Amino acid sequence: MKIISAEQVHQNLNFEELIPLLKQSFSRPFSMPQRQVYSLAPEQSENHDAFALLPSWNEEVIGNKAFTYFPDNAKKHDLPGLFSKIMLFKRQTGEPLALVDGTSVTYWRTAAISALASQLLSRKNSQHLMLFGTGNLASYLVKAHLTVRDIKQVTLWGRNAKKVSKLIADFSILYPAVTFKTSVDVNAEVASADIICCATGAKTPLFDGNSVSAGCHIDCLGNHMTDARECDTTTILRARVFVDSLTNTLNEAGELLIPMAEDAFNKDEIVGELADMCKTPSMLRQSSDEITLFKSVGTAISDLVAAHSVVEKLAD
């Protein structure tokens, strides 16, 4: 059995290959039982420490991703808040195949799924990306979206002005053909965006849904809690809503659960899952002026596919 490091993951993944591979994999048969997330916090505590198991399999490989989530690690212990490993087994024999660093895979597959949804739902002539969030995912999300759309401008919003400035400087060097700027007036920038990508730990909506322009595509991927959300009810009601997994989002995503609790939105109004999107092009964008929204909380099958891709490359 191989032990595959984060460095090996980064060396062997790229969005030009991973995005179409994920689309292909979501179009084929796979199984993905509901993931199990266990709270490690005492009852009535505001602590959000958790342990999770995410199983899945397809015709080639079986996988189980395990991760721990300790959000206070950074300020208390100077450690990352997330640790993860992905165990892979051969589908035909059950033989252990590899233990892959899961944190690095998560960055790649999260950004790749976000960009895949944008490729499927955003207007083909989309040029302005509005990115909320300056965390580890930011660089992956920019690179992934530049892979699927001819982005000319990226507006970056973050609570930490120094981090925003640093990222803009770094991105400007990496992608000199793209204009990078900081957000001064959030709702004004939202109004001019073709694609809005939200990757934050926000507890409350990041922008006014009335500011979203016709034809915009919105991607919310940062929140996994039932009582938090990155977009407001107005945004949900104005959009055709798609999700990565019905089971997972209806158990975790406040973006959907809060409007449902308000009796403003019904789960039957969700157009479809990512697998449906990949297999049925007719269900995608219906007009140039409709607003689309993709809510993702992560899927085990995307972890499986990305991790297996690394294993196969290292075997060549």
Curated annotation (Swiss-Prot):
GO CC terms in record: cytoplasm
Protein name: Delta(1)-pyrroline-2-carboxylate reductase
Role description: Catalyzes the reduction of Delta(1)-pyrroline-2-carboxylate (Pyr2C) to L-proline, using preferentially NADPH over NADH as the electron donor. Together with LhpH, is involved in a metabolic pathway that converts trans-3-hydroxy-L-proline (t3LHyp) to L-proline. To a much lesser extent, can also reduce Delta(1)-piperideine-2-carboxylate (Pip2C) to L-pipecolate in vitro; however, this activity has likely no physiological significance in vivo since C.psychrerythraea probably possesses no ability to metabolize D-lysine via the L-pipecolate pathway.
SUPFAM superfamilies for the chain: NAD(P)-binding Rossmann-fold domains
Subunit structure and binding partners: Homodimer.
Native source organism of the sequence: Colwellia psychrerythraea (strain 34H / ATCC BAA-681)
Top-level enzyme category: oxidoreductase
InterPro entries for the chain: NAD(P)-bd_dom_sf, ODC_Mu_crystall, ODC_N
Keywords, sorted A to Z: NAD, NADP, Oxidoreductase
Gene3D superfamilies per record: NAD(P)-binding Rossmann-like Domain (3.40.50.720), ornithine cyclodeaminase, domain 1 (3.30.1780.10)
Entry EC number(s): 1.5.1.49
pH dependence, record text: Optimum pH is 6.5 for Pyr2C reduction and 10.5 for L-proline oxidation.
Listed Pfam families: OCD_Mu_crystall
Superkingdom classification of source: Bacteria
Recorded family membership: Belongs to the ornithine cyclodeaminase/mu-crystallin family.
Example GO molecular function: oxidoreductase activity
Keyword presence, Chloroplast: no
The reaction(s) this protein catalyses: L-proline + NAD(+) = 1-pyrroline-2-carboxylate + NADH + H(+); L-proline + NADP(+) = 1-pyrroline-2-carboxylate + NADPH + H(+)
